[in-house]
């Protein structure tokens, strides 16, 4: 996939006003993780007794699983780290939206359901359990910024965010996850704000999508893509290794990356050399998991993806 420095920084007009659509799951999660790295001291309201736990998650585990802890709720204690987490999120969000070019902003958070989980029960199964603070922070953000927050239903926050931003004439996407760069538009990476706002054109976005169709998203979402390299691919394209990772995917697409039709043909050929007669089913499966549409409730279709490609290819 392209790196941030490959994109166009001249399309963005700093003198105009934009609406920033923020895929905020990472922003929220990171604040919850930071808090959970430190000890958590709590004070019981009635007795005044204090107790220190290794982390906030350990405190919640005590309340939910220990026979003594089950007698209490969080409300029975003064828990300073909760306030710290709220303050940290507020400060982080302020740094993101405190830009002269931002007229308004919307925060997108992931809800409880996601169609990808129905298609693939192992979706995100490689992730560690979320820190307990995430739920408290999620509820707080939904209350504190209720006029700004939108929670996704049966999709990722990034699906909701992208579709809304793409249909906003002054929309710009605030993001971290590279999955969102598979569509064309204005982007602002809130972990690299010094880079500024950049534009991804349609060919670059399609190339990013094709890369993901090959290598999936193993480390983050447990989407394996093509997790092996067949003998036929090694012989035809001169690549090695045990599986198609991001570097191999980029190498396989390098000579066709400036032509959408040629990229389609290349992806199809690699799937055919990997899966034989079942190549379409496998491409449909991976595409359904990695594709993020600019249209609400539109999903990946291998037949639509292959439009324009000679059926004999």
Predicted regions and their residues:
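Noncatalytic, basic helical substrate-engagement surface that gates or grips nucleic-acid strands
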Residues: 2-168, 174, 185-189, 193-194
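Extended two-metal-dependent nuclease catalytic cores across DNA- and RNA-processing enzymes
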Residues: 2-8, 72, 76, 100-102, ...
